[in-house]
């Protein structure tokens, strides 16, 4: 009798608790590119929240906010929403929230675009940081492939940003 009760209780607990979730496996990709322009000149070209349309080759529409303040939301390619969660005069950090067009990202994705002065402000370093949980990607091979894809895509974006910033 006791064994049956404990077995039933264990099954009920498992059903209520739901499936076991993997522990997060956070990773960061940090990319940098030096630009032969001042931070003001660089940020004016690459910093507007929908400038991403040019340097990442996506469509972009601001659906909420003013492009510079915390709480501003942009929609990329009509399906991915990104909300500014922090901002300075030369940076912003965004996250991908749960919305009606996008279920919550299982990888807890965040990105930061920033520019930093170099050579007493005569040059600029563009810094792009990606932060996400790679655990939901599953296998080691999938994690490596995803990281390589993100690194390539955003390295290409940095090259495009450099060209934009240095153009007349």
Predicted features and spans:
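Bacterial N-terminal signal peptides
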Residues: 8-16
């Amino acid at each position: 009798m006791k064994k049956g009760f404990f077995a039933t209780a264990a099954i009920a607990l498992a059903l209520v608790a739901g499936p076991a979730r993997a522990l997060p496996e956070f990773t960061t990709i940090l990319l940098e590119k030096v630009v032969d322009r001042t931070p003001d000149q660089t940020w004016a070209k690459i910093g507007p929240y929908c400038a991403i349309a040019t340097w990442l080759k996506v469509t972009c529409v601001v659906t909420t906010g003013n492009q510079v303040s915390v709480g501003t939301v942009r929609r990329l390619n009509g399906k991915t929403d990104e909300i500014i969660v922090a901002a300075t005069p030369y940076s912003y950090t965004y996250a991908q929230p749960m919305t009606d067009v996008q279920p919550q990202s299982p990888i807890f994705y965040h990105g930061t675009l920033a520019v930093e002065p170099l050579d007493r402000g005569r040059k600029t370093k563009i810094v792009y940081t990606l932060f996400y949980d790679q655990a939901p990607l599953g296998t080691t091979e999938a994690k490596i492939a995803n990281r390589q894809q993100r690194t390539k895509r955003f390295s290409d974006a940095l090259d495009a940003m450099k060209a934009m910033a240095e153009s007349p």
